[in-house]
Amino acid sequence: MNSVIVLDFGSQYTQLIARRIRELGIYSEILPYHTSAEALRERNPKALILSGGPTSVYDAFAPMPDEKIYELDIPILGICYGLQAIAKHFGGEVAASPKREFGRAQMNIVRQNELAESLLFKNIPDSTVWMSHSDKLTCLPKGFHITAQTANSELCAIEVTEGEGAHRIFGLQFHPEVHHTEFGEKLLSNFLINIAGITPDWSPQSFIDSEIARIKELVGDQTAICAISGGVDSSVAAVLVSRALGDKLHCIFVDNGLLRKNEAEKVQEKLKQLGLNLTTVDASELFLSRLKNVVSPERKRKIIGRTFIKVFEEHIHNEKFLVQGTLYPDVIESVSVKGPSQTIKTHHNVGGLPKRMKLKLIEPLRELFKDEVRKVGKLLDVPDEILTRHPFPGPGLAVRVLGSVSKERLDVLREADAIFIDELKKHDLYLQIWQAFTVLLPVQTVGVMGDNRTYENAVALRAVNSTDGMTADWARLPNDFLAHVSNRIINEVRGINRVTYDISSKPPATIEWE
């Protein structure tokens, strides 16, 4: 299979690069920035991409690739920090920009002459690109020339033109992998298909086939258990692994007391439709007792992760493997296991797990984004009712009840959230939104109901649109709709007298509040 390797220098967008490549039908793999040239040669990639990163190339411990990668006979593309690393290696100069550039910028193509069009920018006009950098290239390396510029970055795109490897090393100061770059997909296609000569041969079906074969070989005659919640991720993971293991996969559904209204009953009904080997465990009292008086979201996540494992270990027999529906966004927001990406928060499926666990992990979806998981699920005949569910965090409502968690506070949140979701479905808005939910805030506010003064809870409604969970924009729901939802919640849910709507995008905010 043709493949592309992305070296991770710490950008929060690194996995997006891999995703965009896969959208072109080409398999991509992310490796640490320090992977040796020899190790890369053994993998035989058809192209190499250097990601962006949060550091400066002049920092004392700035990550730098093996210098011998430039001797590999494959095209190389550097993005943002990747461009700067290439430029520094070849003798160019990088300096702190007097004006940092974050967001959209107008890019203008620079042509040496009418007959010397850059292969990278073939059929790409002047257009909008997405910038996210503090440093910038100030002096070209010898043998390179400019192919694009912006008002603040005169050396916005460069490529080599002399000596061995002509038209084989390229650099971009902007991010083609981000949707805001108008012709980002076309640019990556030019690099991978036209320049590297790669024939697309990767697809969700080929992923399924290779993953089933991998799991069969990994598990052999042993057995596995699956932490299944009824959500998209765990359900698709369970069905995929069951295709490899059959009855050797034992699925465990844990009612942790942190689910949405009537969710436990609905989940069990849906899972039976999948024909999975299922055991249900009611551990709600255990989870709530361990979360009593815990306020820190990080502690909540770690407690929930440890408790999940404890419950599993009490209900296993001879299983040696644990299946989880971990996705790329889970990994990137917790810690980059493949490079120096900065940690945002611990995810239940990743860093929240105890280090000394008896079960070996199988994470079949770890390299996929949410939309790719849905495509895989569709091919595996997972019901649409499951595939269209909005994302739900592993720690459940514990991270939507801000502050301490109790059954009483959870019940208040459940009722409010049920009204919000019910109205979204009634108004045919649910499937138009990536994710929607309600957050119970750790404050009480003054209100008036009838002739009485109230001092009760406030909630925040959150609805966002996204394609992959890496970036998200708040959903512009109609004002009349929001007013109707607010009115229902305040009148029908005892203990709430104020409803707010979250209009924060990601970044700078994350989708979940905790």
Curated annotation (Swiss-Prot):
GO terms for cellular component: cytosol. The keyword Zinc does not apply. Gene3D superfamilies: 3.30.300.10, 3.40.50.880, HUPs. GO terms for molecular function: ATP binding; GMP synthase activity. The keyword Cell inner membrane does not apply. Residues 202-389 form the GMPS ATP-PPase domain. ATP binds at residues 229-235. Its EC number is 6.3.5.2. It is an enzyme of class 6 (ligase). Pathway: Purine metabolism; GMP biosynthesis; GMP from XMP (L-Gln route): step 1/1. It comes from the Bacteria. Homodimer. Catalyzes the synthesis of GMP from XMP. This is GMP synthase [glutamine-hydrolyzing]. The lineage of its organism: Bacteria, Pseudomonadati, Chlorobiota, Chlorobiia, Chlorobiales. The gene is guaA.
